[in-house]
């Protein structure tokens, strides 16, 4: 349990609320992951949170990866698999499938206990980041096509690239079907169905609070706890509104 993938798959928000502060993001991620994980399970949380936080400052994948690696111990299996994938990419940058063969051979599920160990999937995340070449869609697609824990790996690298490229870098083929929906997994069910703009504003306010900075007034006014408030101010926002009878609801 301690080193299964759960340590890095539910901590993206700690990177989002610590923009430009990789070390602080990693510390928050470690605290969250340590509730149920340890060792490499926690190191994965540190890497992902730091990478997301760094992506607010740069879209350069090497800089983002370096920020994540700086938050790992010098000697640990998590660092080893990430560096192995990076070295392979440097020598063979043409085809991610060749790198996947490396992961199957040296870092596969057969090497680790449990049903979904973090190490093989960490390798997939690094592979997708490098071979995706800074493109949101290609990065997510590689993480998915690689197999293993497809949704978790695509989610982690998708968060990193989503921050790095901004909404302009996310193709309509992803934006339109999702339609600003976000589904959480909290204990209180009524809090689990959200829309992305509302989530973004709440995360932004929390980020200002963590940083000890005053949030802009327009952001404060746009977030109204306990209310349903849609202003469509964020670019491309739909607030997950769906029409049941589009024939009668033409624009």
Q: Residues of each region from the PLM?
A:
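Accessory "access/gating" subregions that flank catalytic or transport cores
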Residues: 11, 15-21, 30-35, 49-147
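A glycine-rich phosphate-binding loop feature that marks nucleotide/adenosyl-phosphate handling sites
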Residues: 47, 68-71, 85-86, 160, ...
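Acidic catalytic motifs of isoprenoid enzymes
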Residues: 1-3
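Hydrophobic, membrane-interfacing alpha helices
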Residues: 5-7, 41-43, 47
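Catalytic cores of secreted or luminal carbohydrate-active enzymes
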Residues: 186-251
